[in-house]
């Protein structure tokens, strides 16, 4: 599917020395239904998607992939704590055309950074079980560079073609 859970499952399989079979689903809903119903023995998906079913006792999250425990699930260990040296995080960012003038990028970046620091924004993100992170365009570019370096070998090894 080309998603973070897809490539994370491949990376996890390699680190754990298991042959992870990635099965594409048309969204998290059908995946969760099959996981709860026992048609799928294990799955990888985003924490915000799986947490309500975990809290309802319908499935069990074994580990999270962040560098530290999630503030939304402090009872769930990280993969690293569980003995598998894996760290991967998802993120969202605002992008603009490469041709956008630098002064506009700077203004837009400053406005977005300000909004991301507002308490109302932090509450909205928290309610969606996400953490609001304010960053500058330069910080985002650096994060993207590191992200590409982390995932390029996994994507290449998988043979994935968009």
Question: Can you name each region flagged by the protein language model?
Answer:
Residues 1-162:
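Conserved, function-defining micro-sites of small-solute handling proteins
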């Amino acid at each position: 599917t080309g998603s973070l859970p897809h490539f994370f499952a491949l990376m996890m399989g390699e680190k754990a020395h298991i042959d992870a079979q990635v099965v594409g689903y048309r969204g998290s809903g059908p995946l969760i239904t099959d996981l709860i119903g026992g048609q799928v023995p294990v799955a990888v998906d985003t924490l915000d998607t799986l947490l309500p079913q975990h809290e309802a006792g319908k499935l069990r999250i074994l580990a999270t992939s962040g560098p530290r425990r999630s503030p939304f699930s402090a009872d769930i260990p990280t993969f690293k704590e569980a003995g598998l040296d894996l760290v991967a995080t998802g993120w969202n960012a605002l992008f603009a055309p490469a041709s956008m003038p630098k002064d506009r990028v700077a203004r837009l970046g400053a406005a977005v950074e300000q909004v991301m620091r507002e308490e109302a924004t932090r509450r909205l993100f928290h309610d969606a079980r996400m953490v609001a992170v304010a960053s500058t365009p330069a910080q985002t570019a650096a994060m993207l560079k590191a992200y590409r370096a982390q995932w390029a070998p996994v994507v290449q090894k998988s043979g994935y073609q968009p």
